[in-house]
């Protein structure tokens, strides 16, 4: 039998239906992939795989990696406190390009070379005697950029095309027992094979480094609180500040070179301030440096660098202050046609120096020193 519902009954029925909750299917959160403790990559696909997986692994081991031509072994997106270990030989295929061949960034990163491991880009394939000044385009090797509170231990780098290690934007980086061996470039056209180029960084400590190359062993272009100690430099241009000037950051403050040897090199100690530029070189110390077989300049301090040593007008825009040079041993170290000590300063631009126990002989006295602070001397 059919019964008709009145208006009040219909209203009550509709209200009850609307008040009844609709049962939807239950949803669950997507599972979170756990970060693996250790990942190992090898072979020709290893570089790309490591780059893709760098946020997933607490420890990344690169074992006998071959990096394809024209690409960077890119570990610039590492999670905090990641460890990177190089095993065996890491090699790179050939291409003419700017690089870098290797790039590592991050916070709390530990980079290690296992016993017997080598990073060998086989730079001889690019060497033509012109370095970064011409010839074929050569890739820079290792960008250690934007590393904070990080360490690099026991890396062995062999035969870079040009500059080896660029340190930039780092704060709290410690490098121990690194070897950069470009000695093969002495007779095969290696050029501009700088060991460590440092800029815009602070609290950098390099200990026990061995650098065999054809340019600066260390060049500090800007930065604060930088120390290089217990090092061996051979074949290059010595322990350098600069050139300073003409960059975004033109301040060098509190840099120490100590207990190191420079041999078979063009220069021993060199400070280069660019002619006509502005900046500041302050609180630099060279202490306990031993010089051997220096061809051109035992100690060179210049405020007229203009692309070449002593080439420009002497200017005062980059003062050199609070400089300490002490306990320098170089008796007979300079070639007979080289210069023992050269100091060329602008007016009132070199002040508050400390100069003690400096013995650099074998070469000539430079007859055109300018504005030498009273504590120092160009004569030996």
Curated annotation (Swiss-Prot):
Record: glycosylation sites: 327, 352
GO biological process: cell wall organization; pectin catabolic process
GO terms, molecular function: polygalacturonase activity
Record key words, sorted: Cell wall biogenesis/degradation, Disulfide bond, Glycoprotein, Glycosidase, Hydrolase, Repeat, Secreted, Signal, Zymogen
A cellular component annotation (GO) from this entry: extracellular region
EC nos: 3.2.1.15
Protein name (database record): Endopolygalacturonase AN8327
């Amino acid at each position: 039998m059919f019964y008709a519902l009145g208006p009040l009954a219909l209203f009550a029925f509709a209200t009850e239906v609307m008040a009844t909750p609709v049962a939807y299917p239950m949803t669950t959160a997507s599972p979170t992939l756990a970060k693996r403790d250790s990942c190992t990559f090898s072979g020709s696909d290893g570089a790309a795989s490591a780059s893709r997986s760098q946020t997933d692994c607490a420890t990344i081991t690169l074992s006998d990696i071959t990096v394809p031509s024209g690409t960077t072994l890119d570990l610039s997106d590492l999670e905090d406190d990641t460890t990177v270990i190089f095993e065996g030989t890491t090699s790179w295929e050939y291409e003419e390009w700017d690089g870098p061949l290797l790039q590592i960034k991050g916070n709390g990163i530990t980079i290690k070379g296992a016993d017997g491991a080598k990073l060998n880009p086989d730079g001889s394939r690019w060497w033509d005697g012109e370095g970064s000044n011409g010839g074929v385009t050569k890739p820079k090797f290792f960008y250690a950029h934007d590393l904070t509170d990080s360490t690099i231990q026991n890396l062995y780098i062999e035969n870079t095309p040009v500059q080896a290690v660029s340190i930039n934007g780092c704060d709290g980086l410690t490098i121990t027992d690194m070897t950069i061996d470009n000695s093969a470039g002495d007779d095969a056209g290696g050029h501009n094979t700088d060991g460590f180029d440092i800029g815009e960084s602070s609290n950098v400590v390099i200990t026990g480094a061995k650098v065999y190359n054809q340019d600066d062993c260390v060049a500090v272009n800007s930065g604060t609180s930088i120390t290089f100690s217990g090092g061996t430099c051979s074949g290059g241009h010595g322990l350098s500040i600069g050139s300073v000037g003409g960059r975004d950051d033109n301040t060098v403050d509190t840099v120490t070179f100590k207990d190191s040897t420079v041999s078979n090199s063009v220069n021993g100690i060199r400070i280069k301030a660019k002619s006509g530029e502005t900046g500041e070189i302050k609180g630099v110390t060279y202490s306990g440096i031993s010089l051997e077989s220096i061809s051109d300049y035992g100690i060179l301090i210049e405020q007229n660098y203009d692309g070449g040593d002593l080439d420009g007008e002497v200017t005062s825009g980059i003062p050199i202050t609070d400089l300490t040079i002490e306990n320098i041993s170089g008796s007979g170290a300079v070639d007979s046609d080289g210069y023992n000590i050269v100091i060329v300063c602008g007016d009132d631009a070199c002040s508050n120096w400390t100069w003690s126990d400096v013995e650099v002989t074998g070469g000539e006295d430079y007859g055109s020193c300018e504005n030498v602070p009273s504590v120092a001397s160009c004569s030996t």
